[in-house]
Amino acid sequence: MMRRSLPVVLVSAMMALRVGTVSGKECHGVNVPEQIQVQTSSLTLNGLGLRQATLLKVNVYVAALYVAQKSTDANAILAANTPKHLVLHFVRDVDGADIKKAWEEGFEDNAKAQLPALKERIEQLQAWMVDMKSGQTLTFTSKPDAGIEVDVNGTVQGTVAGEDFATAFLAIWLGPKPPNPGLKEGLLGGPCG
């Protein structure tokens, strides 16, 4: 009797695992949940986007954007005074210097007029950037009236103060000149990569 019930238990367990992942989304081998809890806020996956670099379209990371209210309007997301959560799931190794350069270019392209006011806070963010390996994450949580909490591979580094900084930082992906158009499109609910 024990022999017959073991396969049933195994099949049931496998089905339960499969059901548990139905509510998630996948992009280039990265699986993320549809809903997350950030402190007291329940956030919903707005979209997944693939960061590609160079003319060869090298896959760098899959970004997952969580918001309080799903939207296809980047300006509405940026303007919302609600928590936002951006997770970059690296799919290749990236030097910390390259990450810093990407942030500099992103601020320059999407928040140029604000750069003088943001300079010291950008430097604070840059100080926390390190080499990232495939499978590691950078996580940024925008907290209304507080700024952006920065987490490097599961370790909170601190918070860069100011809602103005949080908006300018998220504009790197949601502003008029994202790192690549498909990345922004995916974060706004379109196809990932």
PLM region spans:
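Flexible glycine-rich active-site/ligand-binding loops centered on an Asp-His dyad
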Residues: 157-183
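Bacterial N-terminal signal peptides that target proteins for export
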Residues: 1-9
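N-terminal secretory signal peptides
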Residues: 24-78, 113
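Hydrophobic helical h-region of N-terminal Sec-dependent signal peptides
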Residues: 10-15
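Mid-length scaffold segments of soluble, non-membrane domains
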Residues: 69-143
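Cysteine/selenocysteine-centered motifs that mediate thiol-based redox chemistry or coordinate metal-sulfur cofactors
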Residues: 182-193
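N-terminal signal peptide c-region/cleavage motif recognized by signal peptidases
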Residues: 19-21
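Short strand-turn-strand beta-turns centered on an Asx-Gly dipeptide
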Residues: 152-154
